[in-house]
Amino acid sequence: MTTQAPPTSLLPLTPEQLARLQAAIGEYSPTQLAWLSGYFWGMVNQQPGSVAIAPVASAAASITVISASQTGNARRLAEQLRDDLLAAKLSVTLVNAGDYKFKQIAQERLLVIVASTQGEGEPAEEAVALHKFLFSKKAPKLNETAFAVFGLGDTSYENFCQSGKDFDGKLAELGAERLVERVDADVEYQELATAWRKQVVEVLKARAPAENAAPGVLASGAVDLLDSSPYSKEQPLTAQLAVKQKITGRASDKDVRHIEIDLGDSGLRYRPGDALGVWFDNDPALVDELVQLLWLKGDEPVEVEGKTLPLAQALRSHFELTQNTTPIVDKYAALSRDEKLIGLLADKAALQHYAHNTPIVDMVRQAPADLNAEQLIGLLRPLTPRLYSIASSQAENENEVHVTVGVVRYDIDGRARAGGASSFLADRLEEDGDVRVFIEHNDNFRLPANPETPVIMIGPGTGIAPFRAFMQQRDADGAGGKNWLFFGNPHFTEDFLYQVEWQRYVKDGLLTRIDLAWSRDQQHKVYVQDKLREQGAEVWRWIQEGAHIYVCGDANRMAKDVENTLLELVAEHGGMDTELADEFLSELRLERRYQRDVY
C-alpha cells in the first residue's frame, strides 16, 4: 500500500522517524494499519502524565462512521463497516459518538451513523450530546452532506429503534441527502446488517474515489489492550460460580444476590465501569410447561443454526422465552386466530401493554393454538445474554468478577414467573457450576484519570454495583480525591446493599460523604433525587472543584429524575436559566464529567 505523506511540518516526527515509519508499515494491510492506529493511541492514553497529540486529519478521509453504542452491538457493527470500507480501499474515520466533535458535522460530506436505542426511545448514552445538538437551534444546514443510518433496537420496547429514526429524520430535515434507506433492526440483526454493509460499501465506492484512499485514525482511541481477549459474546469464557449470596433481608420485597464468578487463570481482564455478559439456559420447568400447552412432546427435531436438535433442548438453550414482543403477539394472533389477540392488533398502546405484561407461556395458555415444533421455533427470538454492571475491581479481586443481581419475580394468574438470567443465577446455577461469560467494555463509564479528582456517585438499588468497583479501585490506587455516594432503596433495615463495606469506607475516610434515601421508612417517599436536591449547594461546590458525576440504574424514571434535579441545582446555584443549565450539563458530558450507566 502506498500513501501520500502530509507535509512534514504538520507532523510531530523528524524526517528520519517518518522514513523509518514508512519503511515499517509497508507490509501491513489497510485493516491492520487501522488496528495499529488504535492500538498505539490506546498505549499513549495508558501512559501516566502523557499528553495526547491530536491526529492530523487526512484530506482523503472523506467517510466518517459514527458509532452510537449502548451495549456494544453498534460499536461492533461500525467496526465491521469500517473494515469493509478499508478493504474496498476507501478512506474512513471511525469515531465513538461520545468523542465526536459534533460542531464539525457541517464539514462532513459522507456520514454513516450506527445507532442503538435505550430506555423509552432515547439515544445511547454516548450519543446524547450529539442528539441534543442536532435537535437544537444551533444545528447547521447539511446540504452538502450525504448519509446512511442503521438503527439497532429491541421490539420488546415501545419506541423501537427510535434513536436511529431520530438521526435519520433530523439529518434529512437539515438538508442532508439519504444515501440508502434506514434499517431498523431487532436483536437478531446480523443478517440485515450484512446486507446493509454491502449496500453502503457499493454506494460509497461510487461517491469516494478509491485512488485517494487512506485509513482514518480511530478518533475514539479504539483498540485497548484489555480488548485483546480471546473471549467475546460469540466465544464466551466458561467460568465457575464461586459465591451466591442474598444481600437483602428476609422481610424485603426485593431479592438481590451478590454473585462472585471465578475466572481462574483465563486472563480475562476488565475495568471498573465495564459490564459482565452472562449467557443462561431457560428454566426446564418453563420449557416443559410451554411444550405441554401446545400438545407437543419436546423430542421433535428442529433446525437451529444449521444443527438438528430436540425441541426441548432448543427451547432451553437457544430461544427467548421470558420476553414477549409485539411482533410475537402479532404472529401468534394469526396462528391462533384468537379474537382477543386479533383485536389488540389495531390498538398499538394496548398491544404494547399486553406484550410487556404477558409472558409467552401465559399468552399460549390464554389463547391455545395447534402449532407444530417448527412453527413454535419460527415464532421466537434467539436467546441473548444479559449484561450486569461489574461490582468489583481486579485490583482487589484479580481472578474474580462480581455482579449484583436483582432477581425478577412476579405472578401471572397465580403462577410464579421469573426473569430468565436472574433466576438462572439465583435459583438454578449451583456453586462451582459452569456459567458462560464475557466482558462488555464501557469506555463511557470510567473513573477520572487523575486520582485527585472528586467523584459523586448516584446509584439506587442495584445501580450501586459499579460504585463498589469504583471504591475498590480508588482504595487500591490510594486515590486522594473525595468520594460522595447517594444510595436509595425502600428500607434501611432490609435493603442497605453492601452496608458493612460502605460503613468501613466511611470509617477509613475513603468515602467522604454518604447520603441515603429510604423511600418507605417514613410517611412521605424519599428518593436519591430528593437527597441530591437537599445537598444542592454542596453538590455545586464539588462540581466547581472539578467533580465527576456518575449515575447508574433505572433509565426510565430514576435517571430522568436525577438529571432534572441536576439541571435545577445547576440553574439555582450556578445562576443560570434552564437553557444555560442544559448547555452546562452537556459540556460536562463532553468533558466526561457526567457519565451514566442506565438500563
Curated annotation (Swiss-Prot):
Family matches, as CDD domains:
SiR (cd06199)
Which cofactor(s) does the record list?
FAD; FMN
Q: Where does FMN bind?
A: 69-74, 116-119, 152-161
Q: Where does FAD bind?
A: 322, 356, 386-389, 404-406, 410, 419-422, 599
The FAD-binding FR-type domain, residue ranges: 234-448
Give the protein family. Belongs to the NADPH-dependent sulphite reductase flavoprotein subunit CysJ family. In the N-terminal section; belongs to the flavodoxin family.
Q: Subunit structure of this entry?
A: Alpha(8)-beta(8). The alpha component is a flavoprotein, the beta component is a hemoprotein.
The record's function comment reads: Component of the sulfite reductase complex that catalyzes the 6-electron reduction of sulfite to sulfide. This is one of several activities required for the biosynthesis of L-cysteine from sulfate. The flavoprotein component catalyzes the electron flow from NADPH -> FAD -> FMN to the hemoprotein component.
The protein depicted here goes by the name: Sulfite reductase [NADPH] flavoprotein alpha-component
